[in-house]
A protein has these predicted regions:
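Conserved AMP-binding A3 loop
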Residues: 29-31, 162-186
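Structural core segment of the AMP-binding/adenylate-forming
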Residues: 46-47, 74-140, 454-456
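AMP-binding/adenylate-forming catalytic core of the ANL superfamily
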Residues: 103-105, 252, 360, 365-366, ...
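Conserved AMP-binding/adenylation subdomain of ANL enzymes
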Residues: 185-202, 210-251, 261, 265-266
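Gly/Ser/Thr-rich phosphate-binding loop
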Residues: 249-254, 263-324, 337
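Conserved ATP/PPi-binding loop(s) of AMP-dependent carboxylate-activating enzymes
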Residues: 331-335, 346-377, 414
Length: 506
């Protein structure tokens, strides 16, 4: 099969009446998903979309996202899912950087859409979905009798670009990683094997589908395997639990922030999720304490995976039924090579800290419109992740920090994640971000930005003393500042660049 579209067609022919996707009180069979995406693809071609054009999608986790996703691919377009909770200027930047030719959006995002549209330097075609019964709308708006064969099928090759996945921009402006249909097919196969996906599985999509991890591990893997996708439009942990149990969800892909919310809810009100057979945690590293507590409470095994937007978020992972080590992201999947190098590109020995490199067919084609950046991160087929980590004597990999986040203090390299892990052991601390800040002595000092648990008080001295009881002196924060909230990404990741920017303005 050359693309995910081939899998969609096979599953439509094999199980036309099987539920492909459901969201609250709406559902689509594989036959309906195929037909409706055909109709929308026809519309996109009629308004001028040509093969290779970039099409932006602006939706929450609703059925229209899934239809639009496959419609764009059928029309020969390149999918660009927009983070709709981003700042308008950030959205504008991404749309212009990728040279978007068309925007398909939810009608309830009309104000956001129009605010973005008026700022763009170039003209784009637009299609709005929503506001009516889905079947009536697609049957009426996008069909005029028989579909025109001229628009119905575009030849898709495996090396054609399928999607552009933008990085979070933690090191500067976001960059669009281009991936081929071949990349997505490979990774869908990888997930099928890793978690033994069958057509009987039901995936929960509570992570926003506009995030690359969700598109890859949830949407594409689900449709590839002919399973059912259960969409959750908004994160409300009580509703999440209800949706899981009402729909007998079997596979749950999440991030550590959601695991914490589930555990906090359990402490308030005991509940079970008996249908869930496996939880996959990705994007951000998860503490050993959370993993162990989750598995103990819910009797659901967790596997942790590691990757980046440039590698389709899978390079290594832990495995069910095999040894797992604390704080490790497991070992490389068989389709991928990983190694650790120093600043001179020399391969390091086990247990030595350096930059993580990844090589495999899951690697991106390159950054859109940024060939110089592509050359910078690719050397001899290896992708330089910018992540600092190590490999132990058993082949397990550990991700310690981002290269640019390492704090240089008095000749020592201090990894913020180590300090953060210690501070999260403090029962008063709810969340923490450790950053390097300039000091009067012209060296970097360590600052802990702390959010305390509700109705809890503490002092700078108390937090510093806690660190001194568990860490070498040079790793202890010199400064502590308390916050009610800190900027986060859509997946709950603390955005340290924005935290530093905020502090610089004070």
């Amino acid at each position: 099969m050359k693309s995910i579209l081939d899998a969609l067609e096979i599953n439509k022919n094999k199980n036309p009446d099987k539920i492909a996707v459901l969201c609250e009180d709406r559902e689509l069979t594989y036959s309906e998903l195929y037909e409706y995406s055909d109709r929308l693809a026809n519309k996109l071609r009629q308004i001028g979309l040509v093969k290779g054009n970039v099409v932006a999608l602006m939706f929450p986790n609703i059925i229209e996202f899934v239809i639009s996703y496959f419609a764009v691919l059928k029309a020969g377009g390149i999918v660009l899912a927009i983070n709709v909770i981003d700042d308008v200027e950030d959205i504008k930047f991404i749309l212009e950087d990728s040279n978007v030719r068309c925007i398909v959006y939810w009608d309830k995002f009309k104000d956001l859409f129009e605010n973005v549209l008026k700022r763009l330097k170039h003209r784009v075609s637009t299609v709005s979905l929503g506001g009516k019964d889905l079947k009536d709308q697609l049957s009426y708006q996008y069909s005029s009798g028989e579909m025109d064969d001229k628009y119905k099928r575009i030849v898709i090759e495996e090396n054609d670009i399928s999607s552009i996945l933008y990085t979070s921009g933690t090191t500067g402006s976001p960059k669009g990683a281009m991936h081929s249909h071949k990349n997505f097919v490979l990774v869908s196969k990888i997930w099928k094997e890793l978690v033994s996906i069958t057509p009987e599985d039901k995936f929960l999509a509570v992570l926003p589908l506009f995030h690359p991890f969700s598109q890859i591990a949830i949407l594409n893997s689900c449709i590839w395997c002919g399973a059912t996708l259960v969409l959750h439009p908004r994160l409300n942990i009580g509703e999440t639990i209800q949706i899981i149990n009402q729909n007998n969800v079997t596979l749950f892909f999440d991030v550590p922030a959601i695991l914490r919310l589930l555990l906090n809810k359990y402490e308030q009100e005991k509940f079970e999720m008996p249908s869930v057979r496996l939880c996959v945690s990705g994007i951000n590293s998860c503490s050993e304490k959370i993993v162990n507590r989750f598995e103990e409470v819910f009797k659901i095994p967790i596997i942790e995976c590691y990757g980046t937007a440039e590698t389709l978020f899978i390079a290594s992972c832990s495995r069910i039924g095999r040894e797992r080590k604390a704080n490790s992201v497991g070992f490389p999947i068989k389709e991928v090579e990983m190694q650790i190098v120093d600043e001179n590109d020399s391969v390091l020995s086990t247990n030595e800290m350096g930059e993580i490199l990844i090589r495999g067919e899951n690697n991106m084609i390159g950054y859109i419109n940024h060939p110089e950046l592509t050359c910078k991160v690719f050397r001899k087929g290896w992708f330089y992740t910018g992540d600092i980590g190590m490999e132990d004597e058993d082949g397990f990999f550990y991700v310690v920090d981002k290269k640019f986040e390492v704090i240089k203090k008095g000749g020592f390299s201090v990894y913020p994640s180590e300090i953060e892990s210690v501070l999260m052991e403090n029962e008063k601390v709810k969340e923490v971000a450790v950053i390097g800040v300039p000091d009067d002595t012209k060296i970097e000092e360590i600052k802990a930005c702390v959010i305390l648990n509700d109705e809890i008080t503490s002092t700078e001295g108390e937090i510093i003393e806690f660190c001194r009881s568990k860490l070498p002196f040079y790793k202890c924060p010199k400064y502590v500042q308390f916050f009610d909230s800190l900027p986060k990404s859509s997946t709950g990741k603390l955005l340290k660049k924005l935290i530093k920017d905020r502090l610089a303005k004070v």
